[in-house]
Regions:
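Sec-dependent signal peptide recognition
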Residues: 2-10
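C-terminal motif of bacterial Sec signal peptides marking the signal peptidase cleavage site
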Residues: 16-19
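Bacterial signal peptide processing site
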Residues: 21-23
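Hinge/beta->alpha junction and helix N-cap segments in small-molecule ligand-binding domains
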Residues: 32-45, 60-70, 92, 115, ...
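Signal peptide-proximal N-terminal region
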Residues: 45-61, 175-178
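Hydrophobic alpha-helical
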Residues: 79, 85-104, 170, 184, ...
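Flexible loop/hinge segments that line or gate small-molecule binding clefts
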Residues: 93-132, 140-143, 150, 156, ...
């Protein structure tokens, strides 16, 4: 997915540069990240690499650290500065739609990345099919449970499009299995500590379940850590989403038998 973003940005800017050979200028890309984590940091590094590959490009990075008010301010600042292209990963579905619309109406191309906003005033969306991800995980767990079992869900940020879509896909996948129940669902806000606290809340209510479906690997790891603190980590199967091929990432955790998937 990162490669597609990288490609569309530089094709677009390449065409602009070709059209402006007579008057070279700096093309400014404003990048508004909703949060900070391993894969977003990797994406930022790849985008910044563009400055070394083409000295006509300036990449400005901003992260709101899950703060809707701050992200609105950052996007509007990019608009006021007159950037040539905006790449935005909205924190929540409706939180920055007005700022996105303002940029688009000012004639600034807007690429929504990873997450959507509830407006149609944007140039392109690049992201994965989060509904399909949730449905695939639901199908996987249903098959592992052979149609009967109890699941707890640890969700991403309430109101964020990946959390909404992954939940919907998961629930649709297990709908044909009346013997499978989601007995608890807690928000973890995409953070490891959020996963810890969500799992602790669940374990206070009940310890009678089979699987943990977490909307991200960080949430799943937090849930695992919370269970481990109570000596319960071997009682449950943990699943997450991301599969980063880094130290401590999802692929390594599956390989080591900590995550089921």
């Amino acid at each position: 997915m990162k490669r597609y973003l990288y490609l569309i940005i530089y094709i677009g800017l390449g065409l602009s540069l070709a059209a402006c050979k007579q008057q070279p200028k700096k093309f400014v890309i404003g990048v508004s990240q909703c949060s900070e984590d391993i894969w977003r940091d990797k994406l930022n590094d790849e985008l910044k690499m563009g400055e070394y590959l083409n000295d006509s490009i300036i990449v400005k990075l901003a992260s709101s650290n899950d703060d809707n008010v701050l992200q609105n301010k950052q996007v509007n600042q990019f608009v006021d500065e007159g950037v040539d292209l905006l790449v935005i990963s909205p924190n929540q579905l409706s939180a920055i739609s007005k700022a996105v619309e303002r940029a688009y109406e000012k004639g600034i191309p807007v690429i929504l990345y990873d997450r959507i906003s509830n407006t149609d005033k944007y140039t392109a969306f690049i992201g994965c099919d989060n509904y399909h991800i949730g449905k695939s995980m639901g199908t996987f767990i249903a098959q592992k449970l052979q149609g009967k079992g109890r699941i707890v869900e640890i969700c991403g940020l309430d109101g964020s499009s990946p959390a909404m879509e992954r939940h919907l896909g998961f629930m649709d996948a297990i709908k044909p299995y009346p013997g499978i129940q989601v007995i608890a669902s807690e928000e973890g806000n995409w953070k490891e500590e959020g996963g810890v606290q969500a799992m602790k809340r669940i374990l206070k209510k009940t310890q009678d379940f089979d699987y943990v479906f977490a909307h991200s690997d960080r949430l799943a790891w937090g849930a695992y850590e919370a269970a481990k603190q109570m000596g319960l980590q071997h009682r449950y199967k943990f699943t997450g989403v991301d599969g980063m091929a880094t130290q401590g990432g999802g692929l390594e955790l599956v390989r080591d038998g900590i995550f089921e998937a």
